[in-house]
A protein has these predicted regions:
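Conserved short loop/turn motifs at secondary-structure junctions
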Residues: 70, 110-112, 329, 427-434, ...
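Long, ordered, helix-rich scaffold segments
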Residues: 369, 482, 486, 495-497, ...
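Hydrophobic membrane-targeting alpha-helices
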Residues: 15-20, 350
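N-terminal secretory signal peptides that target proteins for export/translocation
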Residues: 1-3
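Bacterial N-terminal signal peptides
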Residues: 6-17
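Acidic/His-enriched low-complexity segments
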Residues: 22-269, 295, 398-404, 415-420, ...
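Hydrophobic alpha-helical and helix-loop surface patches within well-folded domains
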Residues: 198, 230-496, 614, 621-622, ...
């Protein structure tokens, strides 16, 4: 037993008056352990928080506050555990029902049973707020408490199934704006300080509580009798004016759709949203006050179709959370995927009518399958529903499996039940559990009554197990006709699982593909309906963007698609084929050079903007990850010429932006790099493409990493062009990572050891991406080990997506065996207590590196 643990046990013993055994039982472990949370949820109810915070103007000064927590307690026989993971010095006083005894143990305030009563209790705490989840800046702050980070700032019951009603009072500099989940009730000003009192909220879990204060501008609008407010820090008035109506319209449409779909009115009163510069996520669904990444809302004139669709999707996603997550909340974060899958699922339904020109089946395919496969093909794949013993690991549960695989699975479930049964089941589920908590099993119970399908067994494979099936096409042709066609399913992990699903199979014919459908129910699925058809050009079992798996094509189909994919007229079939061929490249079945050549042949003929963007992405990834320098040098003139021609011929600014972005990303020849320098210097226009500040900033960074002549002066000039203080600060932060001087880059990376220098996570990630740019991979490989060593600390101190993104930024520019071996050695030598989820996300991030190193090893 460590000295710290001994002291903690002694403290609790003194408080309870019990013996050592009882004290050991009472002492809470760090984080939010499941056993502590389970006891609290069973004994505590009716929680109310009355929080007052004083926010100083000086960044170095602490926030001071008081909170009174009222609750009913059914069993006062054990000490009460509150979560407040800062330090003992932050706790100024604790008063529980008029008694002041407490201990500070492992990030918890522990109140002795002697201070508690059966029934109503009140605990008043004076404290200095912890900074870790306050996101403080010189002239603004915002809280971000998901998944269990409220305890890093405030004393709370930090678990999703102890919802509380919140009354908040904020005192701050008079020039600042502020907002909380509740509506503003009262505002008073004395000198340079203003105090704002906000209305009590509906019951909320702590991760949905949000406070903002600072130098924000406020836009207001009314739609369908409802008032909306948008807080932002954008200094470009024209950009705000260009975007504001669309932003308000998208929120209003989302609310209207969801109220009609669920038959439940919006439950949280006011509707504010805040555009945060360099926000860590796309958005966060705080009830009554959604936070967004400003760059995803306030688009430039050169925004692509994907960016406009992305804005509509993130607004719809976060609005859907008002029902799925906010109104009904998962009981424990092992079911966090439920709120995310329904938010994505609803977003897809409601965005579609706003973009009638878009092929939405293709969008669903491209938005979900590739990202989900990036995880599910790896040795570190995780199931949709995971086991979670402590909320201090909840952040590592997020990722492509819950955001992208789960919507695919949910669409399969909707098809099993039928749209009406599925919708009615969701309505019953939301009504039954409104303002409360529920589990996946609660939902399955509701849906099970609406179908003869065994949903429990279906869920065991699709939801509870990681990975995807390998599905091999088995085709025989006799006399120019299909003799047999079957599909053999295999579990690559050796568990003998069978993933029940529907295969929608394209049988390629000269007149176009014929679609047949079969149901997978066992290891071998016979497509006897195809017997007698003319010999196919190809067989694509993943057509129609429906089936999920690693589809291994027969040799003839693989050869045809690799040579003639552009001949396929149907965009959804083409999209499915591209996703399948990318899998084939990664498995060594298609040479990277042949794949790149296919992209170059396809791009001039591609008519769908979504497909163009996807093919450009595949081409760029193949270019940097799977070709060596000599191969790039040989192909660069043709590649860049094609991109410049595509840029010239693209018909809309959105299309041109996609071509220009790829050209900027891959340019290496003196001619193209020189032209980009002229564009950055504003001496050469890009006809038909209005370039914004963000475009010139990205150009400056890309040119600097190529060490063009005068790169340092170029960065200084670009810094001077940037007027917005937030964007200027980001550029200044990233600049040293672009330096041609290795020592300066080394100092920049070394500074990231200090958690204070990692607070602006998007800034850090941008710098890391340039530090490890493929053009500098040889010099950057020395930083890989240190980045891996920091991962556990990154997980403890960062927000939910940061560990995976840290790894992706570190490893994404590398393809060498040396770096792959560094990662393997790191994983081999991990201590026994290393978090399994961090090990898994390391395997996920390293998977493409491993494959690239293997594919390129003999080049």
């Amino acid at each position: 037993m460590t000295a710290m643990r001994c002291l903690a046990v002694l403290a609790v013993t003194l408080l309870t008056g019990a013996g050592a055994a009882a004290a050991q039982t009472a002492m809470p472990a760090a984080g939010v352990p499941h056993d502590v949370a389970t006891r609290r949820a069973a004994t505590i109810s009716g929680v109310r928080y009355d929080l007052s915070l004083s926010i100083p103007a000086a960044l170095a000064a602490p926030l001071t506050g008081t909170t009174t927590i009222r609750f009913a307690l059914s069993d006062p026989s054990a000490p009460l555990v509150l979560d407040f993971e800062t330090s003992r010095e932050h706790v100024k006083s604790v008063d529980a029902n008029g008694k002041s005894a407490f201990a500070y143990v492992n990030g918890h305030i522990v109140i002795p049973a002697a201070s508690l009563v059966r029934g109503d209790n009140a605990v008043r705490i004076a404290f200095n707020a912890g900074d870790a989840s306050l996101n403080r800046n010189a002239d603004f702050l915002y809280t971000l408490f998901v998944p269990a980070r409220a305890r890093l700032a405030l004393p709370v019951f930090d678990q999703p199934d102890l919802k509380g009603r919140w009354t908040v009072t904020l005192e701050h500099p008079t020039a600042w704006q502020s907002a909380a989940n509740g509506a503003e009730l009262e505002r008073t000003t004395a000198g340079t300080r203003t105090t704002v009192r906000f209305a009590e909220t509906q019951p909320l879990p702590t991760y949905l509580v949000a406070l903002i204060a600072g130098d924000f501008k406020v836009e207001t609008a009314e739609r369908n009798g409802r008032k909306f407010r948008m807080f932002h820090r954008e200094t470009d008035a024209a950009k705000v004016a260009r975007n504001r109506e669309a932003i308000f319209d998208l929120h209003a449409r989302a609310l209207d759709f969801l109220e009609r779909y669920t038959t439940i009115p919006y439950a949280f009163g006011k509707f504010d949203f805040v555009a945060i510069p360099a926000f860590q996520f796309g958005g966060m669904e705080h009830a009554g006050k959604i936070l967004y990444n400003a760059s995803g809302l306030l688009l430039d004139e050169s925004a692509t179709q994907n960016q406009m669709l992305g804005r509509a999707s993130v607004i719809s996603h976060e609005t859907a959370h008002m029902w799925f997550g906010d109104l009904v909340t998962m009981r424990w974060f092992n079911d966090v995927w439920m709120k995310e899958v329904f938010a994505n699922f609803m977003a897809a339904k409601l965005v579609n009518p706003s973009f009638p020109e878009v092929n939405h089946e293709l969008r669903f395919l491209l938005s979900n399958y590739p990202a989900a496969y990036e995880v599910d093909r790896t040795a570190g794949a995780n199931p949709i529903r995971q086991v979670l013993e402590n909320l201090n690991e909840a952040g590592s549960m997020y990722g492509a499996i819950i955001y992208q695989k789960a919507p695919v699975v949910m669409r399969h479930l909707e098809a099993l039940l039928g749209e009406d049964n599925f919708r009615d089941g969701l309505r019953e589920y939301l009504t039954r559990h409104a303002f409360a908590n529920a589990t996946w099993l609660d939902l399955i119970t509701v849906l099970d009554a609406r179908t003869p399908v065994d949903l429990q067994e279906w869920s065991r494979v699709w939801v509870d197990q990681p990975g995807r099936p390998t599905i091999q096409t088995e085709l025989t042709v006799t006399g120019g006709r299909i003799a047999t066609l079957a599909f053999r399913q295999r579990d690559p992990r050796g568990r003998n699982l069978v993933w029940p699903q529907q295969l929608r199979i394209a049988i390629g014919q000269s007149a176009g593909p014929q679609l047949i459908t079969v149901e997978v129910k066992g290891p071998v699925t016979d497509a006897s309906v195809a017997a007698g058809m003319p010999a196919p050009l190809y067989v694509l079992p993943s057509a129609a963007g429906w089936a999920y798996g690693n589809f291994r094509l027969d040799r003839g189909s693989l050869d045809y698609l690799t040579s003639s994919l552009p001949e396929i007229d149907d965009a959804l079939t083409r999209g499915s084929a591209w996703v399948t061929l990318w899998d084939a490249l990664l498995e060594g079945q298609v040479p990277p050079a042949a794949f790149l050549d296919l992209t170059l042949r396809s791009l001039p003929r591609e008519s769908d903007e979504q497909m163009t963007s996807r093919i450009l992405g595949y081409a760029s990834n193949t270019w940097w990850r799977f070709l060596n320098t000599a191969e790039r040098d040989t192909r660069a003139p043709r590649f860049e010429s094609l991109l410049r021609e595509g840029l010239a011929q693209a018909k809309t600014p959105s299309q041109k932006a996609a071509w220009f972005g790829t050209l900027r990303n891959v340019a290496t020849t003196p001619g193209t790099v020189g032209w980009l320098q002229q564009v950055w210097a504003q001496k050469e226009p890009v006809p038909g493409l209005p370039l914004a500040e963000a475009d010139f900033t990205a150009l400056a960074l890309e040119l600097a990493v190529r060490q063009v002549e005068g790169w340092s002066g170029m960065l200084q000039t670009q810094l001077g062009r940037i007027e917005n203080p937030d964007r200027k600060g980001r550029f200044q932060f990233v600049m040293p990572a672009l330096s041609a001087e290795a020592a300066e880059r080394d100092r920049w990376f070394a500074a990231l050891q200090d958690v204070g220098n990692r607070r602006r996570e998007p800034w850090v990630l941008e710098g890391l991406n340039y530090l490890h740019h493929p053009l500098r991979a040889g010099e950057a490989k020395k930083h890989v080990q240190a980045s891996l060593d920091m991962l556990w600390e990154i997980q403890k101190t960062g927000d939910i997506f940061f560990p995976k993104r840290w790894l992706d930024a570190t490893l994404g520019g590398h393809s060498s065996k040396e770096v792959a071996d560094t990662v393997r050695a790191f994983l081999k030598n991990l201590p026994p207590n290393y978090p399994e989820r961090l090990r898994n996300i390391t395997l996920q991030s390293a998977d493409e590196l491993y494959r690239a190193a293997e594919i390129t090893k003999n080049k």
